[in-house]
Amino acid sequence: MRSVELIESWPVENVGTAVVSSDGQVVASHGDLERVFPLASVSKLLTAYAALVAVEEGAVGLDDPAGPEGATIRHLLAHTAGYDFSERTVRAAPGDRRIYSNVGFEVLAETIAERSGIDFASYAHEAVLVPLAMTSTDVSGSPAAGASSTVMDLARFAAELQRPTLLHPETVAEAASVVFPGLDGVVPGFGRQRPNDWGLGFEIRDGKSPHWTGAQSSPRTFGHFGQSGTFLWVDPEAQLACVALSDRDFGPWAAEVWPTFTDAVLAEHRR
């Protein structure tokens, strides 16, 4: 795919990308594939996946109480527990608003650690990184934004998201479906979205505009982007996933080039 070469025009020093088909094959890649990049909020995808493993293993349940009074694991994953973005203050009743929250993911990890008896970084490492051979990925930092990884490690994770081996496919399908539909909210860097649909840790594109995915991305596209200049999306209708990691913080440059890049990848794939 020649479209991956578009990253050469991005105003960044180091960048890499990989495109992964639904059968788990890396069909195209370009740039710094083994460089370790900070993931920022793309970390939430790994945290959410480990949390879902904990659910399937019975360490926690999606409807177990967690966080503010009346909130559950499900609320924390879907950014509807009512927490502020960065402070442990409650701004809304559970389920009333979609407030994107790093704190919610920190509380999620603390809850799983408490109930499993294993610190969350170790749990995530053994539950996700080891079986997927993500040997260059580190999840010892903040579960909301502190992981680091490589393009090729995240390509393995993108393959897992499309053809799950660690979770039942039904669990991943639920995670990639809207939870608490109809709630408005803000996608950082892209403003208020009505509605701001989210799954169990996965942001869902639906009809959001503007957005970090492409105009040609299907409404079912899910994934996450990070303020460190990173993203991972899965488009179930295109049967394709894409990872891009860079070393320049998100800003207007990314809001401009990422959608164009995604549309080019999808267009070439569909030809």
Regions found by a protein language model. Give the residues of each.
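A short, well-structured edge-of-sheet supersecondary motif
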Residues: R2-E34, L39, A78, E203, ...
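Structured C-terminal helix/loop/strand segments within mature extracytoplasmic catalytic/sensor domains
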Residues: T221-R271
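Active-site helix/loop module of the DD-peptidase/beta-lactamase fold
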Residues: P38-V42, L46, A54-V90, P94, ...
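Glycosyltransferase-associated regions of secretory-pathway enzymes
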Residues: V19-S21, L62-A66, G201, H211, ...
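Active-site Gly/Thr loop motif
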Residues: S142-A145, V151, S177-E237, R271
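Penicillin-recognizing serine hydrolase domain
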Residues: L132-A133, D153-R156, E160-R194
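Active-site-proximal alpha-helical segments within enzyme catalytic domains
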Residues: L45, G104-T111, A145-L167, E174, ...
